[in-house]
Regions:
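RNA pseudouridine synthases
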Residues: 2-200
């Protein structure tokens, strides 16, 4: 486990966590059956930067620095969030173009983004529990790069173009990557990774 004593007392603590499926992005129970961040041995003074819903997986950042939420997640900062979404059926070029132009969700258009079919298709760690496959319906992994992150936005976007999301993994926030960090594990960020946050 990462030794938090490596952080000088004056330095912000910044951690990367591979949030598994079925974990809520908070330390206190929410009344559901889901596990919380308290189950993973984090230092006592950190809190999540942004959120991933319980059904989503991947990179979740935690810190003891209060202003990092705005520094990392406000659209004006331009820190792109990259998601890999496993969707029903293989999207055609027009569906991907629709995602890039923006789709209407709840009466408003999403901001332009980048969307593409992953080639080759990634081999991801198994999800527990596994997703439900429809026997005669193919699936595919696509990537989306967004600078905004409304509630369930990626799932709503892919559903709006006819490709419901089966599994969603956030793989990158700005220059910070999930990499090969295993589900349920966390680590402190390197000096170079921290610089990519604090110098922007």
């Amino acid at each position: 486990m990462f030794d938090v004593r490596c952080f000088p007392k004056s330095a912000a603590m910044l951690l990367a966590f591979h949030k598994p499926f079925g974990v809520v992005s908070q330390f206190t129970p929410d009344g559901s059956r889901h596990r919380t961040l308290a189950d993973f041995g984090f230092p006592t003074r950190v809190y999540p930067i942004g959120r991933l819903d319980a059904e989503s997986e991947g990179l979740l950042l935690l810190s003891d620095e209060a202003d990092l939420n705005a520094r990392l997640l406000h659209p004006a900062r331009g820190h792109v969030r990259t998601y890999w979404a496993q969707v029903e059926r293989v999207p055609a070029a027009e569906a991907l173009a629709q995602l890039e132009r923006g789709v209407k969700i709840g009466g408003r258009m999403t901001l332009p983004c980048s969307a593409w079919l992953l080639d080759p298709q990634p081999v991801m760690p198994p999800r527990v529990p596994p997703i439900r496959f429809r026997k005669n319906v193919p699936d595919a992994w696509i990537a989306l790069e967004l600078v905004e992150g409304k509630n369930h936005q990626v799932r709503k976007m892919t559903a709006a173009v006819g490709h419901p999301t089966l599994r969603l993994v956030r793989v990158k926030v700005g220059a910070l990557e999930l990499g090969d960090l295993a589900p349920g594990k966390w680590r402190g960020l390197s000096a170079a990774e921290r610089a990519s946050v604090f110098t922007r």
